Each structure stands twice: as structure tokens, then as C-alpha cells.
UniProtKB/Swiss-Prot annotation:
Protein name: Cyclin-dependent kinase 2
Cited Gene3D superfamilies: Phosphorylase Kinase, domain 1 (3.30.200.20), Transferase(Phosphotransferase) domain 1 (1.10.510.10)
PANTHER family, A to Z: CELL DIVISION PROTEIN KINASE, CYCLIN-DEPENDENT KINASE 2
Biological processes, Gene Ontology terms: cell division; G1/S transition of mitotic cell cycle; regulation of G2/M transition of mitotic cell cycle; regulation of gene expression; signal transduction
GO MF annotations, alphabetized: ATP binding; cyclin binding; cyclin-dependent protein serine/threonine kinase activity; protein serine kinase activity
Organism: Entamoeba histolytica (strain ATCC 30459 / HM-1:IMSS / ABRM)
Length: 291
């Protein structure tokens, strides 16, 4: 790895340690991830290699670029494009984010997601810390450490995905079969956070997270969400909250509230897709050419 001069540790992601490094061949900064072994004698899991290979094919302006992969001393190194900050850092230093800037950020997130979902890849860990911003201000989806292919329709997945505050209700209720709708819910939570400058559902544990959601959006019933009572962690004793009008939660552009309503639909199959969300009137200023 003499090609890459490590400069500083940036943190630890899903995969392992992340460092800022200088690429001495291409003369640019990169983000270098060193993959953790599950056990010392395991080597690198075949599934990780296979899924990372898929990410090498994910070339899109709003998906972080994976430049290369190296194997050295039984460790796997991923070489990503370097981004200056993440959305969490951006929000932390911004007192108020104008609606036009929010529109641009969410639009780019959805463009990246639509591309991933088209290629049948779920991100499964959408949160501000995993949404990167490069020096040009372009939004990049990052950290695909929990990403999975959905090409096998009846495949069952773990429900232990997505950081708690951004976790979709179907995941919290124990669903093991799910699709891109989980990423849409997470994006809606980020969208709302950009508007209110505060996390929407700050649960301390899974049940508290459910209650935080239900107390704002209402406790789902079979009439609202067909099949909800059959999910593993659903309880008939859940408190019965009524849904609040989203206008009382978000004091912003009417079209933004309407889009949030469609992104926060409980029934996963009815939740708006990333591709359809991009066509929503909220994004008209970005979709319509200037006259």
C-alpha cells in the first residue's frame, strides 16, 4: 500500500477504520477503508467481496466512487473518493437551511437512491453521517457496508439494519422481507431533519422508537396498513395515537409537506418510490428548464 500515504483517521464506519490518504499516483486525496475481519482466522467474508464488487459497477454522480480494492496481509482495503464532509457535519454548522438548499440536497439523495434501487441494491443505512458532500457541494451516498442485493424475491434479511432514528417501522416491527421503501423512510426522516434542524424520532430503544413515530404519525391499524398486526413485534396493546397533521410538524413549503406525507406512508408498497419522488411538484424548480 505504498501508493497511499495515510494522513489521518477519519473514524470507523460499518466496515472498519477509515483514513484520509494521499494517492501518490493520481495526486489526489482518497478515503481508505480497512475491512475488519470477523475473526482472526476467517479472512475476508466472500459475501463482502461479492457485494463490494457490485459497488464497483455503481457509477453515478450521487454515489460515492469506489476507485479500487486491494488485498494485503489478509485485509481488504477499499479506496473511495474523498469527500470533505458529511450531511451531519453540514447540518451541525448551519443555523437554518433554506428550502431551496434542502430541495437540492434531498433531490440528489433521491437520485442516488433511484439509481441504486433500479440496480436492485438497498442501501439499508441511510443517515446524515452516510451522506457525503464533496468540495463542489455534490451529494454522494456513502458507506454501503450494509447494502444488499434484492434480486432474489423471497430472500429474507435481518431486521438489524439502519441506525435507530432513521429506521422504517416495518423494520422496527420485525419484518425480514422488505425493499427500497426502507431507504425512502430513512430519507424522509433526513428530509424532515433538514427542515426542522432537529431529529424527528429520537428513540432510546426499539419500542421507544416505535412510540416516537406512532405519537407523531399515528398508531397503524389494519385499515391503515394491511398486514401490520401479523408482523413479529406488533402488539395489540400499543397505545392508540392519532396522526398529527404534518403541517403542525413542518412549517415549510406546502409541496414539501405533501412529499413528506407520501414518503412517510406506513404501508411499504404504497410508500412513494425514489423514482416517483423525483417527479413530485416539490422538485419542479429543478426539473423544469428555465423559461
Amino acid at each position: 500500500m505504498t501508493r497511499y500515504e495515510k494522513k489521518q483517521q477519519l473514524g470507523e464506519g460499518t466496515y472498519g477504520v477509515v483514513c484520509k490518504a494521499w494517492d501518490t499516483v493520481c495526486n489526489r486525496y482518497v478515503a481508505l477503508k480497512k475491512i475488519k475481519q470477523e475473526r482472526e482466522d476467517d479472512g475476508i467474508p466472500v459475501t463482502s467481496v461479492r457485494e463490494i464488487a457490485v459497488l464497483l459497477e455503481l457509477k453515478h454522480p450521487n454515489v460515492v466512487d469506489l476507485y479500487d480494492i486491494y488485498l494485503e496481509d489478509k485485509f481488504l482495503y477499499l479506496v473511495f473518493e474523498f469527500c470533505d464532509e458529511d450531511l451531519y457535519q453540514f447540518m451541525s454548522r448551519s443555523s437554518k437551511i433554506p428550502i431551496n438548499e434542502t430541495r437540492s440536497i434531498v433531490y440528489q439523495i433521491l437520485q442516488g437512491l433511484a439509481f441504486c434501487h433500479y440496480h436492485q441494491i438497498l442501501h439499508r443505512d441511510m443517515k446524515p453521517q452516510n451522506i457525503l458532500i464533496n468540495k463542489n457541494g455534490t451529494i454522494k451516498l456513502g458507506d454501503f457496508g450494509l447494502a444488499r442485493l434484492t434480486t432474489i424475491n423471497d430472500r429474507k434479511y435481518t431486521s438489524e439494519v439502519v441506525t435507530l432514528w432513521y429506521r422504517a417501522p416495518e423494520i422496527l416491527l420485525g419484518a425480514t422481507q422488505y425493499g427500497g421503501a426502507i431507504d425512502i423512510w430513512s430519507t424522509a426522516a433526513i428530509f424532515g431533519e433538514l427542515i426542522n434542524k432537529e431529529e424527528l424520532f429520537k428513540g432510546r430503544c426499539k419500542i421507544d422508537q416505535l412510540f416516537k413515530i406512532f405519537s407523531q404519525l399515528g398508531t397503524p391499524t389494519e385499515d391503515i396498513w394491511n398486514g401490520v398486526t401479523k408482523l413479529p413485534f406488533y402488539l395489540s396493546t400499543f397505545p392508540k395515537w392519532k396522526a398529527k397533521d404534518l403541517h403542525t410538524i413542518f412549517h415549510t413549503d406546502e409541496r414539501a409537506v405533501d412529499l413528506l406525507q407520501k414518503m412517510f406512508i406506513y404501508t411499504p408498497e404504497k410508500r412513494i418510490s425514489a423514482a416517483d419522488a423525483l417527479k413530485h411538484p416539490f422538485f419542479d424548480p429543478l426539473n423544469k428548464p428555465n423559461n
